[in-house]
Amino acid sequence: MTWDVFLSTKALKQKDKLSKDLKFVLFLLVEDLKHKGGNPGNQWPNYKKFKGLKGQRKNDDWRHCHLQKGNPTYVCCWKVFEDTQRIEVYYVGTHENAPY
């Protein structure tokens, strides 16, 4: 069964600012999320679940991975909703401006 993956309005605007290569990497990540759910696998660099972030409730499932290493490093952050099998990508951009 596939998951519903959508980008927030903010993430859509951020995606438009990415280079062509980064847009393709984001596309590959979204495809992995659709088919594998919130855990796209260890092949994604620095993939981790967030715990204890400001504003995060105990049952919130927030995750991230790096899209491109180097300077600047680009990351993608998403929320997983297991009960409805939905994933919301809420940030795509540089590590320096990431909401964590």
What does each model-identified segment do?
Residues 1-73, 81-100:
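Basic, Lys/Arg-enriched alpha-helical interface segments
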